[in-house]
């Protein structure tokens, strides 16, 4: 990358990074499937020379500098559990739980350095609710929540979101109409702040994160979905 400087406004600048090194990623995981439905996983991933654009307040002048720099380490390890469950014929749900330890280190972050670690928890619940069969109405409802996190010198506030979609199948299931809203309460993009060794910065990127979509599809003629070979599950004791 070139060392050019571009200006966002009278205070913010974007600096290029000559000599930026490619990152190297390593990862591993161990998974256990219980009763062919419950999934438990241990995971680890580490990126050496990880690069990411972050903000830094210059110490010699009034300027906010955005620059992509190589970090020494970006590491995550933790556990993940996926628990599906069903209530009658009207509710099909999946609960995903994740707990991880994040470590980020950079010894040459402008005139600073950082070596930070944090425990992070993530919960996600996906639900499919059968409202009625005649008419064929289905509600998809998903909720997500994440505890405070870090990103370089940033402290990331907790984040949560709710997504909802209503699907109507009609004309002998050849036609489908879906109305969907993502991030219903505009809470999915967290507030970020820097309070680190004299750096003081607030960043709110969450405005207008709610989205609405309408999707219509129609299957003509006698089209049938292509059948695929079933997966061999004998290794699960089936």
PLM regions: where:
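Structural signature of Gram-negative outer-membrane beta-barrels, strongest in the C-terminal barrel
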Residues: 1-48, 135-142, 155, 159
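Outer-membrane beta-barrel translocator domains and adjoining extracellular loop/strand segments
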Residues: 1-6, 10-14, 45, 50-59, ...
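Outer membrane beta-barrel strand-and-loop segments of large Gram-negative receptors
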Residues: 15, 21, 27, 39-96, ...
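Outer-membrane beta-barrel transmembrane strands
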Residues: 21-37, 42-44, 76-77, 84-86, ...
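Outer-membrane beta-barrel strand-turn architecture
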Residues: 24, 34-36, 46, 85-91, ...
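Transmembrane beta-barrel strands of outer-membrane/channel proteins
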Residues: 26, 32, 38-46, 95-101, ...
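Outer-envelope beta-barrel architecture signal
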Residues: 34-38, 77, 89-95, 135-139, ...
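Conserved C-terminal beta-signal and adjacent last beta-strands/turns
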Residues: 117-238
